[in-house]
């Protein structure tokens, strides 16, 4: 039998606990214990200093991701020391010269002495740490760099390698250790046939190990290996990687090759290569070092099927939101205009938003938006989170979503780089629906004349899938006075009643957003449980106003009855 409680349970900690250091404030990062020499190798200090000196940059912005910020002060110190003694060796050599070419040197000295030039000292280079990026950490933050008027950005960590619009960039992917022998053993277990066509690739933080792995495998007897190299081309057959010569001449031959990738690639890369290569195997690097690591085969059929289901859901959406998720990627303004034009050609409405770092809470404020199109780098454009209320797609997926059900063909191919969309040739003339004039009284004069459209996911009929194709509103008048009012100045037509089913107008332009606010976000007050009818419409019975209860709490009477309740 359970004993009775002698005292109330303690549901809070004592006040003195806040004065005791029971746990460390933050977990110490292992890289903070590295020596200066190890840190210099990890962050490639010498190469960074060399590129800064050659280009004579004076204002250098250092962009670190969040996980590398603890090392930022030490990297800053190492770069500052290196830049402080940049010209010591050069000055020493000039002072200790052997005097060769004395005649030319004397003549040059005389010419220089005759010039009246102010001998001002060259300004010292200044370093700035960019702690918080405006968008994704994989992209170069030109916006933050321009706040300090930087000449160059040094980007640390993994990067999408998207071309920038304004500032030059020095990429430092950092160096991570990778035991070579376990990689070789895992490769041999995965590909026992040494004649198989295999492409070696790695994440940017492990790409410096590819030459060593390639040389070791060639010694083992593999004959059809290709080691990729980094390039700045997201539109390549393998994004940001070189490809074999045969693939460069004929991209379709990439399907004959298998891909062995070191470290987990981004999801956008997996979906892009799913239909391009024969198979993909990933060598994981997140686990503890072991000799029994097995490469994992990749299957993207479920992810691609989910993306296609999103497209069918968005085919009947009347309003799209364009999310600007970058201000640094080259040609981002061109793809914004391209997307706006595509949405307008489909008879739909688009609104543009710049929200900085994307999250579900920000876009949930705009409930009238049926789907979002992200304009960003080829990695950050893919948003596959279930936290978002409305789907988020890429410009490539938008092209498929805007096509009709009879034109949309899903081949399994997928891409996230918008530059390939801009490089596509111009499409043929639009269909006859696009060419029809909205001023013709016989064409699309009534909503019933348009073919019905249904949501393929729910089966529901959608009345306004292409609101921007509706004809301009016309005032129906039965009398001469009404006709003159409709044809008069704008002031005379200000109180003209909107036709039933017609969308709201702002400045003479159809506004689906305003219509959503009018119909979905407008409170009609008391009595809004029935529709207001006009004189020329069939009246409908509404609830009569009757006398309710009256009295005090001790007893109420209803109407003329004297009985109390």
UniProtKB/Swiss-Prot annotation:
Quaternary structure and interacting proteins, as annotated: Component of the 2-(3-amino-3-carboxypropyl)histidine synthase complex composed of dph1, dph2, dph3 and a NADH-dependent reductase, predominantly cbr1.
Stored InterPro entries: DHP2, DPH1/DPH2, DPH1/DPH2_1, DPH1/DPH2_3
MF terms in GO: 2-(3-amino-3-carboxypropyl)histidine synthase activity; 4 iron, 4 sulfur cluster binding; metal ion binding
Major location (coarse): cytoplasm
Domain of life where this protein originates: Eukaryota
Xref: PANTHER family: 2-(3-AMINO-3-CARBOXYPROPYL)HISTIDINE SYNTHASE SUBUNIT 2 (PTHR10762:SF2), DIPHTHAMIDE BIOSYNTHESIS PROTEIN (PTHR10762)
Free-text remark on how the cofactor is bound: Binds 1 [4Fe-4S] cluster per subunit. The cluster facilitates the reduction of the catalytic iron-sulfur cluster in the dph1 subunit.
Keywords per UniProt: Cytoplasm, Iron, Iron-sulfur, Metal-binding
GO terms for cellular component: 2-(3-amino-3-carboxypropyl)histidine synthase complex; cytoplasm
Role this protein plays: Required for the first step of diphthamide biosynthesis, a post-translational modification of histidine which occurs in elongation factor 2. Dph1 and dph2 transfer a 3-amino-3-carboxypropyl (ACP) group from S-adenosyl-L-methionine (SAM) to a histidine residue, the reaction is assisted by a reduction system comprising dph3 and a NADH-dependent reductase, predominantly cbr1. Facilitates the reduction of the catalytic iron-sulfur cluster found in the dph1 subunit.
Pathway: Protein modification; peptidyl-diphthamide biosynthesis
Keyword set includes Iron: yes
Descriptive protein name: 2-(3-amino-3-carboxypropyl)histidine synthase subunit 2
């Amino acid at each position: 039998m359970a004993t009775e409680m002698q005292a109330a349970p303690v549901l809070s900690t004592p006040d003195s606990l806040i004065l005791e250091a029971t746990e460390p404030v933050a977990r110490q990062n292992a890289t903070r214990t590295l020596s200066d020499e190890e840190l210099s190798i990890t962050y490639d200090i010498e190469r960074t200093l060399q590129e800064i000196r050659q280009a004579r940059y004076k204002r250098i912005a250092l962009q670190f991701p969040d996980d590398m910020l603890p090392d930022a002060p030490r990297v800053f110190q190492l770069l500052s020391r290196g830049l402080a003694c940049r010209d010591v060796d050069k000055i020493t050599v000039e002072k200790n010269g052997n005097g060769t070419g004395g005649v030319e040197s004397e003549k040059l000295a005389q010419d220089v002495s005759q010039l009246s030039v102010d001998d001002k000292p060259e300004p010292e280079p200044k370093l700035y740490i960019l702690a918080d990026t405006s968008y994704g950490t994989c992209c170069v933050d030109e916006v933050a760099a321009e706040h300090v008027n930087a000449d160059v950005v040094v980007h640390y960590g993994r990067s999408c390698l998207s071309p920038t619009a304004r500032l030059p960039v020095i990429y430092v992917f950092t160096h991570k250790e990778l035991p070579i022998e376990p990689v070789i053993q895992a490769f041999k277990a995965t590909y026992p046939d040494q004649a198989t066509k295999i492409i070696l690739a790695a994440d940017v933080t492990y790409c410096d190990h590819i030459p060593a792995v390639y040389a070791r495998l060639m010694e083992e007897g593999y004959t059809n290996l290709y080691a990729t190299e980094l390039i700045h081309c997201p539109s390549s057959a393998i994004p940001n990687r070189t490809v074999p010569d045969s693939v460069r001449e004929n991209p379709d031959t990439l399907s004959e090759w298998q891909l062995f990738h070191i470290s987990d690639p981004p999801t956008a890369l997996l979906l892009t290569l799913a239909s391009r290569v024969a198979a993909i195997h990933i060598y994981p690097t997140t686990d503890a070092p072991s000799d029994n690591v097995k490469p994992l085969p990749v299957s993207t059929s479920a992810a691609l099927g989910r993306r296609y289901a999103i497209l069918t859901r968005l085919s009947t959406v009347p309003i799209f939101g364009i999310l600007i998720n970058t201000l640094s990627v080259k040609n981002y303004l061109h793809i914004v205009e391209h997307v706006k034009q595509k949405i307008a050609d489909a008879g739909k409405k688009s609104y543009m938003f710049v929200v900085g770092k994307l999250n579900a809470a920000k876009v949930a404020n705009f409930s009238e938006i049926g789907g979002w199109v992200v304009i960003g780098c080829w990695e950050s454009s893919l948003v596959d989170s279930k936290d978002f209320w409305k789907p988020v797609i890429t410009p490539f997926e938008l092209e498929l979503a805007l096509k009709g059900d009879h034109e949309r063909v899903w081949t399994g191919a997928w891409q996230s780089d918008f530059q390939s969309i801009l490089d596509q040739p111009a499409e043929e003339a639009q269909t006859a629906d696009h060419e029809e004039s909205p001023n013709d009284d016989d064409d699309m004069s009534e909503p019933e004349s348009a073919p019905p459209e249904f949501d393929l996911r729910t089966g529901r009929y959608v009345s306004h899938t292409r609101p921007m194709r509706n004809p301009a509103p016309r005032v129906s008048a039965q009398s001469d006075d009404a006709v003159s009012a409709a044809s008069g100045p704008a002031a005379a037509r200000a109180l003209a009643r909107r036709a039933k089913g017609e969308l709201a107008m702002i400045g003479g332009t159809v506004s689906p957003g305003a219509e959503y606010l009018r119909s979905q976000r407008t409170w009609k007050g008391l009595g809004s449980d029935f529709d207001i009818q006009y004189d020329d419409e069939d009246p409908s019975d509404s609830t009569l106003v009757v006398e309710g209860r009256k009295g005090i709490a001790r007893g109420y009477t209803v109407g003329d009855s004297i009985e109390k309740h």
